[in-house]
Amino acid sequence: MEEVITIAQIVHRGTDILSLNNEEIEALVDEIYSTLKGSNDIKNIRLIDFLFSLKDFVNHVRAEQSKLPDLSMPMEAYIRQLLVNPDVVPIVSEKKKELRVRPSTRKEIFLINGTHLAVPAEVPIEIYGLKLRLKTFSPQCFMRMAEIGSFSPETLGYVASGANLTNFIRVFMKCVDQETWKKNGEGVVVTTKENIIQFTHQYIELYKFLRSGGHSWLINRLAEEMVHRKLDRENQGSHISSIIETEEVEPEEENIKRVIFFLKELSTMYSVFPVFTSGYMPLLYDLYRAGYLEVLWNPVEQKFLQHAEQREKEQMILQQVDMKLTEVTTQARQYFKIMEEKIGRVQSDTIREILTMEGKVDDPSSILQEVIKACGKQEAELITTEYLNIKKQWELQEKNACAHLKLVKQLRSGLQYAESLKVLESIRVLYKEKNNTTNWNLCKACGFKLLCPHVDMLIQLQAAEASYDTMRTKLMKFSGINKEKENNQGLIYSYFCKICGEELAHFIQEDRTADVGVIGDLNSKLRIFIWQETMKACTFIHFGKLVDVKQFANIAVNVCLPLIYSIENIKKEEDYDPLTQLYAVIYIYAYILNLIYSSQKNKEFLTITIHGMKADSSLNAYVTFLLEKMTQQYSGIINQLSEITDQWIANNFREAFKKIIHQNGLQGLSVQDDTKVLLTEILLDPLYDYAATVARIDGSIPMHKPRTPKEAEYEFKTVIGRTPAELLSQKEFYDKIYTSKYRPDFTQLARLNDVYFQEESLRVWWGGRDEEKISTLIYLRAYELFLKYLQNAPNFNSELAEFKKYENAYGEQKALLAQQGFYNIFDPNTGKADQRTRLFEYKKLPISTLYDEKGLPHKWTIYVYKAIDSSQKPAEIEVSRKDVIKKIDNHYALADLRCSVCHVLQHEVGQLNIKKVQTALKASLEFNTFYAFYESRCPKGGLHDFQDKKCIKCGLFTYIIYDHLSQPELVHDYYNNYKDQYEKEKMSIHSIQIKKDIAVPPTETQPKPQQKPWTFDYGKIIKTAKILDISPAVVEAIGAMEGRSYADIKEGQGAPPPPTSMDDPRLMAVDSAVRIFLYNYNCLRHISTFNKPPMHIERLVKHLSYEEKEDLEKVLPNVVNEYHTTFKQLRVTDPASALLYSIEFLCISFLTLYEIKEPSWVVNIVREFALTELNTIIQSEKLLSKPGAFNFMIFGEDFVCSGEDSSMDDISAYSSPGLFGEDIIDRLDDPFSIEDVDISLDVLDNLAPQ
C-alpha cells in the first residue's frame, strides 16, 4: 500500500500532464512499472502496456499542441454532419493523371481514397507521409520524408481500422504544383475516406478531453486501481454497482468509478482474444472513433463489450474467407493465362463468353470448374501441372537464393546465340547429373529444378545453326502432349514438352508433308508488304539526324526477306497467308531492334531510338516496347491465327533478332544531305505555305513561283526573315534536327488530307530543342505579314468586290468540271486512254486483250522503260516488278507492259489473231470439262486406280488433270482416245434428266394480261412547261443536255438522234431523275415513319402535327403505277419510246401532284414539293450544258491556258492533264515507283547556298 500511496503522491490530483516534460513522464511510468514488475497477473501486464501507449500518445500531443485546430473552426461541425449523413462527401473524378474534385458542399473538407487524392476545386493539398513500425506493445511512428510543397499542417491523428493500427498521416491545405505531385506523390500513405472522417472526429473529441484537464484524474485513478488489482471481477462489479446506486456520490467520482470498471473489463477481454495482443493503443482509438468513451456520462460499457467481441469474431472469419478467395482468384487467373499460352486464345474466349452469359464471370470457383470441363483430359492435366509448377516457382523465388536462378534468367532472356551458349556452359557446371534427357536437370547446390533438357538441346542446336529437319528430329523425343487445331491454313499441330510442359518451338508445326510449308507464297507482294510496314514503323522511331527513309525500308526488305524464305519450304501461290505476314512483321521489328542495338554499341553509327525513350535505355526496355507495339498494331492478323500466343510471338521475336545479328552483324544508316532536306522541309511545311500565301496576297512577293535563284532567295528571306545561307550557317540549329516520318507527296494537293503518314507540322518533324528558333521566326514573320495585310485591307476589299462579280460564274464552271464524267478505257489500237463524257457507248474490246492465242490469260508483269533522253544508253530496259527499285532511275520512264506468258506488248494485243484466241479458249473449255468429268470416274468403269501417279486401267496421269499445257501430247492423246466414250456418257446423263423433267406433270398457269399499248402525249410536256415558265423543248431535253448550248436547247436545235440502244446513257439519266422524284415523293407520303427524313422534305411539313403526318399516306395518291414494268419493256424493244415515256411519266406525276385540290391543308405542300423537285432536275441538267459567253480571260491568261496548251475550248483549257489520271493513282499506290517518292522541288537548286 505504501508503494501505491507514493505513486498517488507523485500523480496528485489536478496535475496537468501536458505540463510535465518527457523526463517526468518517463519517471512516472518507470515507477509504476517498478511497482508492478514483480506481479504475474495478466491484468497488470496489460495495464503496463496501456501506460506505455498512453505515454507515447501524450508525447505526440505535446509535440503538436501548437498546431492543433481551433475548436471553433467549422470543420468540427462539418465532420459531425458527415458522420450523420455521409452522402455529402465530395465526388472524386480522375482525368488522366490530373486529380480534381467538385465538392457538393463546403470547401473545408478533403478526403483521401486509395491512391487518389480528392480535394475541393482549385484547392490541391500537400501530403507529408509517415509510415508506422510496430514493436512488441508500443507503436512507434517513423516519418518517411516525402514532403511535397511547403510545410503548413492543419490536422494530425492516428488512423485506425478495426483493432489494427495502420498509418500516421499529416495533411496540408496549401497549393502544390502538379508536376511535383506526379514525381514525388507515388507511395504516399493514404487510407479510406471513412477512416479519415473517423480519425478526424476521434481526434477532436480526444483533444477536447485532454485540454479539459481530465487526463490528470485518469492517471490518478489508474494508480488507485492498482491497489485493487487482486480483487476478483465479481466483487469489483458489485462494488461499482453499489457506487452507482448511491445518490450522494459526486458526478465526477461516479464517472471515475465507471472508467475504472470499464478498464477492468477491457483487461478481461484482452486476455480472451489474442488478436488484441498488439497493445492497448489500437483499442484506445477504436473507443474514440466509435464514441464509446461517452461512458463518462452514459454507462453503456456492457453493450460495447458485446459489440466488440462479436465484431472481432466476424473480422477473424472474414480474414479467413478473404484469404481463401484470394487464393482461388489467383488460381483462376493463372488457369486462363496458361490456357492462352499453351492452347490458344480461342478456347479461353469461348469460356469467358459462357461465364458471362451465365453470370458467373466474377465467381472464381465457377471459372475453375468451367476451365476443367471445357478442356480434355490431356489439356486439363497440362494446365494443372503448369499451375503447380508456377506455384512451386513462387515458393522457390521466395525462399531459394541459389545462384542458378540468375543464370537461368540470363539464359532465357539472351538475345544472341553466343551469349546464350556461354551462359549454358556455366549452368551445366551446376547439373546434379550429367547427360540427363528424361527428367529435370537438378541443381547440385540447392537440389531444386534447374533446367529442362529440351532447353539445353535447343540452345545447342540454335548456336550450331542446325537445319529444320535436325531440330525437328532431335526435339520430337521430348514431345508428350500435342494439340490439333484447324484454322484457315489447315491443321496445325502444337507439341509440348512432356517434362516441363513448355511448347516446343514453332519449327515442328505443320510438318506432315515435306513439300508444303506453312509460310505460303513469298512473291513480290511480300516484298511490298515488308516495304510498306517498315515505312509505317517510322512513325515511332527517332533518328538522330535526317535519314533517307527509302534506304531504311530497302535495307529492311533485303535483310528480312531471305530470312523469311529460309524458315520453311516456300509455297508458290498467288497470295501469302496471315502467318507469313506475322513472320514479316516480327523480322521487321527485329531489324529495327538491331539498328537500335548497333547504335548503342558503335557510337559512329547514327543514333536511333524510340520516341519517348532515352538513347541509353536498356535493350530489354526496347524489346518490351516493340512487343507491345507489335501486338497492338497487328492484332487483326494475330486474331486470325488461333494458335498464336504472346509467348509464341516473344520467342520468335528473340530468334529473329538472333538471326539478324548473326547474319548481318551491327548495322547503321547513312545520313541525308542536311542542307537539301532542311530546305525541303521548310518549303513544304504548312506554316511556311501560310506565310508565303499571306505575303503573295499582301503583295510582298510576286504571285508566281520563283523562276530564278534571286527570286527564290528573295521569297525565302521575306517569309523566314533571313537567307538560306544565313540560316544554314547556324550549325547548332540543323545538326540536331531529325525526322523519322514517311513524308507524303505534297505536290499532289488533292491527297494532302488523305495521306497515311502526314504529320502536324515542321515542329513535329524536327522535334529537337532547337526547333523553337525556326518556329518563332516563322510565326513572327507571318504575324508581321498579317498586320501588313490588315493595313492594306481596304484596297484588298475593293479588289475582292470586283472579283465577287464573277464568283457565281466561276462556281458554275467548277461545278461543271466536278460533274463531268471521265471513262479511262485503254485503247489497244492507239495506246492511249479514251476520255469521254457519258454521251457514248462502251467500245467492244477484242478478246485478245484478255487472252493470248493459246487461250491463257495475260500477265502484265514485265515493265518496259524507255530512256527520257535519246542519248541515254541503253534506250530501253525490261525489268520485273521486284527489280524496278534496283535497276531503274529517274532517267527512264514507263513506256509499256509486256506479258510474261506470251511476251506481247500491251499496246500490240489488237494485232493477235482473234480466231486463234477463240479456238484456243473453246479447246481449253472442252479440255477442262472433259478432265473434270473424268477426274474421279474411269472411262473403263468404276473409279481410277492410280499407281505411281497413273491409272492402270485407262492410262490417265494425275499431273495432266489440271495442267493441260506442260504435256500437250499426252493431253490430246488421252482426249482423242476417250472422246467418243465421253460424248456417250454425257448424252446418257442428259437423257435421264430429260425423262425426269417429262415425268413431272405441267402446272396450270393463268395467262398474263396484255398491257395496253403506250402512245406519247406531247400535251403533257406543253402543260408542264407552261407551269414552269420554260420552253417545252427544255422539258423534252431532260437527260440529253450535256455538251449542248443552252440557247440551242431552248430553241430545240442540235438535239441528238433518238437512242437506238438499251445502254444509251440518256435512258439511265432520265430513269434516275424519275426514281429520285418518286423516292422523295414516297418520303413525303410516309414521313411519319422516318426518324431522319431528308431536310428539304422535313421543312415542308414541319408545321404539321404528328397525326396529320400520318394522314399524308392516306390523302396523297400513289403515282408509281406501272412505270417500272413499262419502262423495262420499252427499253429493250424500243429505246427511243422508252426515253419519251420516262419524260412523259415525269410530267404526268408532276401534274398529278400540282393539280390536287383537296384536302386544303396539303395543297400548298404538294405544289411546293412538285415545283421544287422538277426545277431541281432541270437545273442539274443545265449544269451539264456548254458554258455560255462568259469571258474567263478577266482572270488572266494563265488562268485559262497554261504551258503549251493552245486550245480555245474553255473546258479542255481549264482541265490540267494528268491531275486525276490513272498514272497519278498508280504512282501514288506503287511504293517502288522512282517518280517523286522523295519530295523534291525545283526551287531547291535555286536556294542552294552560294
UniProtKB/Swiss-Prot annotation:
Keyword Lipoprotein: no
Induction: Expressed in the late phase of the viral replicative cycle.
Cellular component aspect of the GO annotation: host cell cytoplasm; virion component
BP-aspect Gene Ontology terms: symbiont-mediated suppression of host cytoplasmic pattern recognition receptor signaling pathway via inhibition of IRF3 activity
Subcellular location: Virion; Host cytoplasm
First-listed, main subcellular location of the protein, grouped into a coarse class: virion
Keywords recorded for this protein, A-Z: Host cytoplasm, Host-virus interaction, Inhibition of host innate immune response by virus, Inhibition of host IRF3 by virus, Inhibition of host RLR pathway by virus, Late protein, Viral immunoevasion, Virion
Function: Together with the penton and the other minor capsid proteins (p17, p49), forms a complicated network immediately below the outer capsid shell, stabilizing the whole capsid. In addition, blocks IFN-beta transactivation mediated by the cGAS-STING pathway and regulates the transcriptional activity of IFN-beta. Mechanistically, suppresses the phosphorylation of host key adapter protein TBK1 and degrades host IRF3 in the cytoplasm.
Entry's family note: Belongs to the asfivirus M1249L family.
Subunit structure and binding partners: Interacts with the minor capsid protein p17 and with the hexon capsid protein p72 capsomers; these interactions form a rigid zipper structure that stabilizes the capsomers. Interacts with host IRF3.
Name listed for the protein in its UniProt record: Minor capsid protein M1249L
Organism: African swine fever virus (isolate Pig/Kenya/KEN-50/1950) (ASFV)
Species lineage: Viruses, Varidnaviria, Bamfordvirae, Nucleocytoviricota, Pokkesviricetes
